[in-house]
Amino acid sequence: MKRFALLLMAVALILPTAFAKKKKDVDRFPDGTEIPEWFRQNESVNIEKLGKKYVLTDYEIFADGRIHTEEIQALIDKAAADGGGVIVVPRGTFMTGGLQFKQNTHLYLEEGATLMGSDFIGDYPLGKTRIEGETCTYFGALINADGLDGFTISGKGTIDGNGLRYHKQFWLRRKWNRQCTNKDEQRPRLVYVSNSKNVQI
């Protein structure tokens, strides 16, 4: 009986330690950084709480097959300057290059809407970014958010990277250069988020 009591005491001492270790593993990223509460947020975004809506077509940005990078970026900048709001992509296919979202700006795609990336790398502005494990000057992604607090992408629409041409060229180069990287082929990325918090996609 005494041996059984000692065994129970040993188990009682071990279990809290084991559970504490498990909880610690769950609550931290692999690099040891604590996982913040916002990272667990899984409720649908309510754009009615995000400020004014900036619908592309209200600002003469149309689904006409043309690249509208400058116009959409100007609208993002306007929304930020006016205190923030939601860039709304309505039904249709809207073409653009890289876009840099600002503090208090958000992206919403209506059902049937497509924000399609240009297949010309020159439409993605150069800037300091990270790709393939290094910080460098490289072409931006289609959607960029750096240093933001409270950025969201939501809606039932589609963000289309339009990357088939880059994909084909990359694997064509790989046939004669096995060391070819995404940077060598100058492939843009779809979404790039860094140095930000309270992000929901």
Description of each model-found segment:
Residues 6-8:
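Small-residue packing motifs within transmembrane alpha-helices
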Residues 2-3, 12, 18-88, 93-106, ...:
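Extracellular "leader-to-stem" segments immediately downstream of a signal peptide or signal-anchor
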